[in-house]
Design a protein with these regions (language model features):
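Glycine-rich, flexible loop/turn motifs
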Residues: 2, 60-61, 107
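Local cysteine-cluster metal-coordination motifs and their immediate loop/turn environment
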Residues: 1-8
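Glycine-rich phosphate/pyrophosphate-binding loop and the adjoining helix
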Residues: 9, 82, 86-140
């Protein structure tokens, strides 16, 4: 990590790290598995650590994305309110918030869709919320 670039051969991890560095704002989403983010999302975050924060010798992380805004999105098959009571979605949001926070992103909102197994599409209410959050990302 001394160079700020992963030493593994060039792959999607390197490409994602570059995208994080180039972005002005971020919309990040994951399905909920066992009360947390998907394994693919966790692996991606593990691979892009050098692009998200610097780790000086004193051990205190230095966020590399201060001033950038982010929206978090989750979906799970567990119906509300059990998705909240059983900490399905809250565990996922907490994990993403912690990673993005240490990286310097300001969370401007979240979208949570529970009970997806029985849904035939995205409810209009969620589409409206998505538009409002997009405006929050675009307008400081």
């Amino acid at each position: 990590r001394t160079t700020g670039v992963c030493v593994l051969p060039e792959d999607d991890g390197h490409r994602m790290a570059k995208e994080f560095c180039r972005c002005d704002a971020l919309v990040i989403g994951t399905p909920v598995y066992w009360g947390n983010m998907s394994g693919q999302m966790k692996l991606m975050f593990d691979r892009v650590v050098p692009a998200m924060m610097d780790e000086p010798k004193n051990g205190f992380p230095i966020p590399l994305h201060k001033g950038k805004r982010a929206v978090m999105v989750t979906a799970c098959t567990t119906i509300w309110p059990f998705s909240w009571i059983c900490r399905e979605t809250t565990g996922t949001l907490h994990a993403m918030k912690e990673i993005l926070g240490y990286s310097g992103f300001k969370i401007v909102g979240k979208m949570v869709l529970s009970g997806t197994r029985k849904r035939k599409g995205v409810p209009q209410k969620m589409i409206g919320k998505g538009r409002r959050l997009a405006n929050k990302l675009l307008h400081v």
